Amino acid sequence: MPLLLSGKEFRDDLESACCLAIQTPLEGGAETRLLRRLKAAGYRTQITSVRGFGDPEVFLLKLHGIRPPHLGHQNIGRNGALGEVQEVIPQLHELLSEEQPLALWLLEGQVLSRSELLALCDLSEKDPQLKIVVEMGGERKLKWQSMRKFLEQ
């Protein structure tokens, strides 16, 4: 399997498309080999799940507020009926300040809507350092394609 030995074809497709939809075998292993090949090629890698993303651009690049879960009886007079808002630092802002390219590997991408997937494509096209790989479910063999081509199907 030359693909798993070098990962060059995958890396070339990732650099040209900026955002890839990938389908991996359910038993796993293929994605970690590809991540190791990307690291060996000079990429920094980060793996995260897309559940709870909200707006992808804000979640990944901007300071944003979240409301922590309600854990029982609390004083609503202090923070209003909606609760307090906590500021959360962005996931990728500091990683993109370095000159090394960054490969963001997103798990469970099938839960994202079409508009969120297109926003990820736009985000990776705006920033030349950022390359995004979104796992879009399982398949019998490893295959990938540009996210925009995947969404056209």
UniProtKB/Swiss-Prot annotation:
Record keyword Cell membrane present: no
InterPro entries assigned to the protein according to its UniProt record, in alphabetical order: NAD(P)H-quinone_OxRdtase_su_N
Its EC number(s): 7.1.1.-
Subcellular location: Cellular thylakoid membrane
GO molecular function: oxidoreductase activity, acting on NAD(P)H, quinone or similar compound as acceptor; quinone binding
A cellular component annotation (GO) from this entry: plasma membrane-derived thylakoid membrane
Keywords: Membrane, NAD, NADP, Plastoquinone, Quinone, Thylakoid, Translocase, Transport
Catalysed reaction equations from the record: a plastoquinone + NADH + (n+1) H(+)(in) = a plastoquinol + NAD(+) + n H(+)(out); a plastoquinone + NADPH + (n+1) H(+)(in) = a plastoquinol + NADP(+) + n H(+)(out)
Superkingdom per UniProt: Bacteria
Topology of this chain in the membrane: Peripheral membrane protein
Family: Belongs to the complex I NdhN subunit family.
Function: NDH-1 shuttles electrons from an unknown electron donor, via FMN and iron-sulfur (Fe-S) centers, to quinones in the respiratory and/or the photosynthetic chain. The immediate electron acceptor for the enzyme in this species is believed to be plastoquinone. Couples the redox reaction to proton translocation, and thus conserves the redox energy in a proton gradient. Cyanobacterial NDH-1 also plays a role in inorganic carbon-concentration.
Subunit structure: NDH-1 can be composed of about 15 different subunits; different subcomplexes with different compositions have been identified which probably have different functions.
Protein's UniProt name: NAD(P)H-quinone oxidoreductase subunit N
Lineage, highest ranks first: Bacteria, Bacillati, Cyanobacteriota, Cyanophyceae, Synechococcales
